Every structure is written in C-alpha cells, then in structure tokens.
C-alpha cells in the first residue's frame, strides 16, 4: 500500500525532547523527493544478477561516496540468484526510478540478505522496492533479512516485504532492515516480514541500533518470534525515536519468554506526532514499550493508539515519564491466555511507572475480555502516580487525575480512514468530547492539512476534530453503547 504524499507539517515549537532529537538526527533526515544523482555516478545498464553492467558489478567498482544510478533501466526487477550484494565502501547511494518501478528481490530461501553493507557510513536506498531476502545462520547471530548495514541507513520511497531472519539458537534482529547506527524511513511501507530464533530477538521488521526517524511510512504485519526474550514486534530502536504521519499496525511480538512492545520498543526519548499504532500484540506494552529509564521521556501528540493487546499495559507500558496531548487511546485489551498472564494493576490503556502529564486526550473503552469478572482501569500503574494536565475524557482511572476530568463514554466510531495518511476514531454527535478540549497550538487534528483543529466553539478532546455541520445526529448511539 502506498501512502499519500507527505503532508505539510504544522508550524509548532518543538517540545524539548523533540528538539534535542531533531538536532541529533538532522543530518540523516530523509528527503521527501528523490535526491539528484551526485557526481562519481556508476550507471547500471541491465537487470542481470552479475556481470558487466549489473548492479553487483557497479557496487564492486564503487568507492567511498559514490552513487549508483538505476533510473535508466528498462526492466522492472533484479533477481539475486548468487547471494547478497556485498558493499565494502562508505557513503554509498543507490538511486532507483521510484516506488513500484523497480524491485530487487531474492528467492526467499537463499539464506542471504539482499544488501550486506560492511563499509559503514551512510547507506542510502532511494526509489527501490525490496522483497524475499532471507538471512539464515545456524552457527551465529543473524541480522537484516533484506538490508544489513554496519553504519547508518536511509530508505526513501520504497515497498519492502517478505523479508525474513532465522538464527537457530543465536540472537536475531531486523527481520527486514538492520542498521547498527541510525535509520531514517520516509514514504516506506514494510510488511509481512519477521524473524525467528530460540535466542533473543529485536525488531520484527526494523532494528535501528542508534535511533530512528520514521515519516509518512507504514510498518505492518511483522512478527518477532523467540522462545527467549523479544523486544519490538514491528520496530526496535536502541536510541531515540521520532515518528510522524505513520502507521504501526498488526505486528506481533509472540516470544514465549518475555515479549515487550508489540508495535514499538524504544530505549531512548520517544516522540510521536500525527500517527496511529493499532492492533499490535505482545506480553508487555501492546502498542509501545520503553526501557525503564527516568532520564528519557515519551511525548505523544495528536495520535491514536487503538486495538492493541497485551497481558500488561496493552496500550502503553510507560517505563519513562510521559506527556500526551490531543490524542485518543481506546479499545486496547487484555486477553485471557495461559501464555499471557494478566496484570490488572497497570491498566488496559496506559500503565504508569513515572510522572504523567495528559492534556485534551481521550482514554476510554480499554478492557479485559475474559469471564472472571475482573476489570482494569483505563489508566493504572505499579504505584499511585498523580496525573497532571487538564481537559481530558476518561472512562476510568486507578490513578489520581485532574479535577476537571470528564468521566463518560466518548462514543467513538470504529478505527477507519477518515482522511489524512493515518486512521482515526471519529466521534459521534452528542459526544462529551466535542468542544471540551484545548487546541494545544496545533493548527490541524491528527489528519493534517485540511482538517482544522477547531471547527466548533473550541477544540474537541482527542486526536480527531469533528465537523459539527457534517455529523449525523442519528449516529449518536450508532456504536452500540446506548
């Protein structure tokens, strides 16, 4: 699935942790448009696996800082039949013709990545789709089903799928992409990829050892499977994470030992804007889990976290101080499962371990589905932690909350494509969330340009701003909560 073109970003002052992270990764941020082909360019003349004029041959002749031009090919796919293309230089750029125009693929059972970069520096892959890379090691760790790099990785305008890693009893990471340094993804779809091992596992689709920037992208259908410890069903970031206008959905971390972060696991500062994390599964933190660390922080603005599952904190397992603005956290659930012990104290929406500031946010309809009659609050935690903020709508909380908190059913519609590049929960007419929120300095709601943050007397609570003139009064109870 190709996401729409990047949306213009609202002019907002960066929050402190977002500013620090933006400075740290500014040099590696991916451009939206294709970069012009720089000097010292090697042109690929055919789609053969090897030999003169092939991509493999061009890489073999490249030096540090070179670019390889694949835009002049008349063919649409390159099949690698003799193993991975080995990259031994720094700062290499592979420039393709664009999304869906050229596919680099393996056989799915070769035991090798597609691109294996030992050179370090920044590897850039622009406008090239990747599929059926399969990294397998029986005697050592295995990393990067489609791309492995010792350095930083920048991928732009690409569809990546059916990449796998298997490491027998050794560690495995990055079912599709693995970078020991930082990683930048812009207008990238990664899906139906994963890793399996009897050892530790990190990042069902993405492993970014030094941090990640994810923009206008979708990571979906990834699986992290281990009998030991697994972190990050979709994405593992060993540093900070900055994510904007992206979807992390339908990923699974089903490790039998200790599985954290069905969608995302982040070890550093976590900044998420205008994004949706939905229908992911793990034992701890169905949508998002982080390292237990009070020196870093989580910030979530104008985003939706919905339909995720875990035995502990199926929405967010907040092992860092957390700030949430103008967001919707709903319909996350704790399943009754022999392999997934339930910890009701942490809440079905958010489990707090450090301080929390929540403003103009809906946290509701987060539940346990079992037959024993036990319930979990939308907000919980290991110890009492007073929640700061204002203008929120919750259905229940085991933590002290601001005095102006509204306790009511927000009457949310099902998660759907309501415009913009990510899915949202619309609110029905008559919802207590309408005109009761704060705009937070945002010009638009989660959907971006064209969806004003204030359409009525004041902003609505949550990630979605209803249009009072377009809401059907007959849908007040259409969600079945009448």
Regions found by a protein language model. Name each.
Residues 16-28:
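Bacterial N-terminal signal peptides
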Residues 72-80, 91-139, 397, 407-413:
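Right-handed parallel beta-helix/beta-spiral solenoid domain characteristic of secreted/periplasmic
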Residues 1-13:
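N-terminal secretory signal peptides that target proteins for export/translocation
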Residues 151-154, 179-190, 210-221, 227, ...:
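Predominantly extracellular beta-rich ligand-binding scaffolds that present long acidic/polar faces
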Residues 46-69, 460:
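Acidic Gly/Asp/Thr-rich repetitive segments characteristic of extracellular carbohydrate-active
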